[in-house]
């Protein structure tokens, strides 16, 4: 099933836009409204599974927290394992971490050291691509463990915030179902 214009429009229309959230001047794209629509949620998963079913993926990595909501079902659909990347202190086994820059400060992500094996072909999944900082840190974690990032997939791409270009500089191609302006 290749995504049709009608299907993609349905997905786009299922995502609510909230003005001035979380602060004045921001137009927030709320993917949780897509989750409330079982047809839209299933369609988003089905389209990603269809795109990657013959790509040789053997692990899907999802970033905290909404990346779990899309990454885990995509992993099930592909018949492969799912690996969560989390904020510090949330994973019980030995981890490695990566610090990345935010607009005001820094943040950190962690992954279990035994979750990715050398040579694993990994699909990174998250709900939204904005500036690309979270995904760039996730890619660094995967590569430090010897994994190969095959692609990064998103439901939403805020195309004017530079995330796609940032990932390209790291050698990562990306795919998104629904483009929106970020401003």
From Swiss-Prot:
- Quaternary structure and partners: Homodimer.
UniProt record, GO biological process: adenine salvage; AMP salvage; purine ribonucleoside salvage
Source taxonomy: Bacteria, Pseudomonadati, Pseudomonadota, Gammaproteobacteria, Enterobacterales
Extract the signal peptide range: none
GO cellular component terms attached to this protein's record: cytoplasm
Q: What is its main location?
A: cytoplasm
Q: Name one GO molecular function term.
A: adenine binding
Top enzyme class, one word, equals transferase
Which of UniProt's keywords are assigned here?
Cytoplasm, Glycosyltransferase, Purine salvage, Transferase
Catalytic reaction list: AMP + diphosphate = 5-phospho-alpha-D-ribose 1-diphosphate + adenine
Q: Which family does it belong to?
A: Belongs to the purine/pyrimidine phosphoribosyltransferase family.
Reading the lineage from the top rank, the first entry is: Bacteria
**Under which EC number(s) is this enzyme classified?**
2.4.2.7
One Pfam family assigned to this protein is Pribosyltran
Q: What is this protein called?
A: Adenine phosphoribosyltransferase
Look up the record and name the pathway of this protein.
Purine metabolism; AMP biosynthesis via salvage pathway; AMP from adenine: step 1/1
Give the matching InterPro entries.
Answer: Ade_phspho_trans (IPR005764), PRibTrfase_dom (IPR000836), PRTase-like (IPR029057), UPRTase/APRTase (IPR050054)
Protein localization: Cytoplasm
* Function as written in the Swiss-Prot or TrEMBL entry: Catalyzes a salvage reaction resulting in the formation of AMP, that is energically less costly than de novo synthesis.
């Amino acid at each position: 099933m290749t995504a049709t214009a009608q299907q993609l429009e349905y997905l786009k229309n299922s995502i609510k836009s909230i003005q001035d959230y979380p602060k004045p001047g921001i137009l927030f794209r709320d993917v949780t409204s897509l989750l409330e629509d079982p047809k839209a949620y299933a369609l988003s998963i089905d389209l990603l599974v269809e795109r990657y079913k013959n790509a040789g993926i053997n692990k899907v990595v999802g970033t905290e927290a909404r990346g779990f909501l899309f990454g885990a079902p995509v992993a099930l659909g592909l018949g492969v394992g799912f690996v969560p990347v989390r904020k510090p202190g949330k994973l019980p086994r030995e981890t490695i971490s990566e610090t990345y820059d935010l607009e005001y400060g820094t943040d950190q992500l962690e992954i279990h050291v035994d979750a990715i094996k050398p040579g694993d072909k990994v699909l990174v999944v998250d709900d939204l691509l904005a500036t690309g900082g979270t995904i760039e840190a996730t890619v660094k974690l995967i590569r430090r463990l010897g994994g190969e990032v095959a692609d990064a997939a998103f439901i939403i791409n805020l195309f004017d915030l530079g995330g796609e270009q940032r990932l390209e500089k790291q050698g990562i191609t990306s795919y998104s179902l629904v483009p929106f302006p970020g401003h």
